[in-house]
UniProtKB/Swiss-Prot annotation:
InterPro entries: Ala_racemase (IPR000821), Ala_racemase/Decarboxylase_C (IPR009006), Ala_racemase_C (IPR011079), Ala_racemase_N (IPR001608), Ala_racemase_pyridoxalP-BS (IPR020622), PLP-binding_barrel (IPR029066). Pathway: Amino-acid biosynthesis; D-alanine biosynthesis; D-alanine from L-alanine: step 1/1. The keyword Isomerase applies. Its EC number is 5.1.1.1. Keywords: Isomerase, Pyridoxal phosphate. Substrate binds at R130, M303. Disulfide bonds: none annotated. This is Alanine racemase. It catalyses: L-alanine = D-alanine. SMART domains: Ala_racemase_C (SM01005). One of its GO terms (biological process) is D-alanine biosynthetic process. The active site is at K35 (proton acceptor), Y255 (proton acceptor). SUPFAM superfamilies: Alanine racemase C-terminal domain-like (SSF50621), PLP-binding barrel (SSF51419).
Amino acid sequence: MKPFPRAEISSSALQNNLAVLRQQARASQVMAVVKANGYGHGLLNVANCLVNADGFGLARLEEALELRAGGVKARLLLLEGFFRSTDLPLLVAHDIDTVVHHESQIEMLEQVKLTKPVTVWLKVDSGMHRLGVTPEQFATVYARLMACPNIAKPIHLMTHFACADEPDNHYTDVQMAAFNELTAGLPGFRTLANSAGALYWPKSQGDWIRPGIALYGVSPVAGDCGTNHGLIPAMNLVSRLIAVRDHKANQPVGYGCYWTAKQDTRLGVVAIGYGDGYPRNAPEGTPVWVNGRRVPIVGRVSMDMLTVDLGQDATDKVGDDVLLWGQDLPVEEVAERIGTIAYELVTKLTPRVAVCLA
């Protein structure tokens, strides 16, 4: 018997999405971003499905070590860099690249003793103002890195966009211009484009693109849908009806008696709640997919359950599957209704949700 709730992960969808992104950026290599447990899709699940990716981007050293332990041989890059000097021998031992974005990291690289140099991607703050060396610092920092024997040469170069998910916002052009002017003539790879860059800003694609959310079939742009770009949702979040009840007009349901039926109807109780990562703040009317149609959530989402209005003439029965988001109900639509972003929904599923390749 299949577990529920479960996140069914489609290997064919992941492979399709990688192919679509390659088509968008034919001259670029693809660093598939699989941080946050593969955006909730399962770190090794995703990496094993995307064996044709040229590399993988991660946020934590532990994620990179898990991939190496799982047999992944491709280039790995720590997008936030290393945090401690004791991380550096592990980078060497497991052939893991690191971003450098701060003075403290440079000092650790200059002081540590290593058996071979580390491959470094220097992050430039071209305008996001979160991580990276400023244009004023760049020449000095670059010279220090070039002089450091613990750093492999050439040094690679990167930046990150603040507003690429706003296709009409020309701040991305400003960032591209700043980065390109600063790094002109220097050797090494360049990477600028995240998912939005790859899809909407072709001039940003460079030597490597770093797609994240788009690999999972989701658009990075508000009001857009991944399917508009040929992407296929890789996750179907599925549970089931555990009760179907006749419900009288003017009767409430759930904690706080928040919702009251306007007419006689049939309610379905679905075995998923905020204890599984489904948002408690999902408002009345948020859709789920039952037997080929959208039906609305009614009442408050509780820890283990939520309630839906199946309609007066519903023939749904206990045991029927319920899709919370996926190929028949885009996660972008659900996120917009709830007032959040799809990234948050797919990455916040709790361990109670079984994640399995479909």
